[in-house]
Amino acid sequence: MITITNRQGKHLSVVVEGLENAPAIIFSNSLGTDHGMWQPQVASLKQQFKVITYDTRGHGQSDVIADTTVQNLAEDVIDILDALDIEKAHFCGISMGGMTALWLGIYQPTRFYSITVANSAAKIWNEEGWNTRADAVIENGLADLVATTHTRWFSEQFDYQHDALAQRTIQSLATTPALGYAESCRALAQADLSTQIQQIQIPTLVIAGAFDPVTTVADGVFMQQQIQNSELAVIDASHLSNIEQPELFTQTLSQFIGSIQ
């Protein structure tokens, strides 16, 4: 694990694995998790790629940063690429990370071969809901969310209790700084890229979870219809589809990336 300093002078925790001179792929975690959620994908893809994972600001080992916007989340990715001297990469983000992917596709397309937008939406939930959740987390901590999160993250078909990565990911929510979580909630409250995503020209993969109650298949269909050079894959999973269906997720991503090079 290395630490890079972003343009705001704050620290981001980054992990680089795989082949030094291979094409780079960078993964961005969901709200309330950390870089470790990508373990199955890293294990598979590091045989042929330079694989970068990082803790989104306010999560894991990365600094909590006040007044965060989705633009800030995306600019952190550019700062990581710059620090690692990577001119261009594939990008895959899930949920909040998917919103980051969309922003990068709109405003920084020259830095990416492709974006993958997993279990996300051009607008996730609503402003009032996010701000209310942020206030509640600041006041009461994350314990209430931890107790119910499995109902949103995983489907009833998935035995999350006996899946080591699912348990570790739930634990990462329990250890996420409340202020970092709340800052991300407020960023998502303000984020709406619905009208801008038509501008995306680079190859885009949209992955939706058939049982996802948070970012629905309809959200995925909307993005696929708006983004010209895009395709949609629906996976039998809930919100964290890369953990619930790791092999299928990785295979879908690999085939998409393979079709570009």
Residue ranges, per PLM feature:
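Conserved HGGG/HGGXW glycine-rich cap/lid loop of the alpha/beta-hydrolase fold
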Residues: 10-63
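Active-site loop/oxyanion-hole signature of alpha/beta-hydrolase fold enzymes
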Residues: 36-43, 52-92, 251
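Conserved alpha/beta-hydrolase catalytic His-Asp/Glu region
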Residues: 125-128, 140-198
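Short beta-strand/loop motif that positions the catalytic acidic residue
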Residues: 200, 206-208
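Acidic catalytic loop of the alpha/beta-hydrolase fold
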Residues: 210-215
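Catalytic histidine neighborhood in serine/cysteine hydrolases
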Residues: 217-240
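Catalytic histidine-centered segment of alpha/beta-hydrolase-like enzymes
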Residues: 237-250
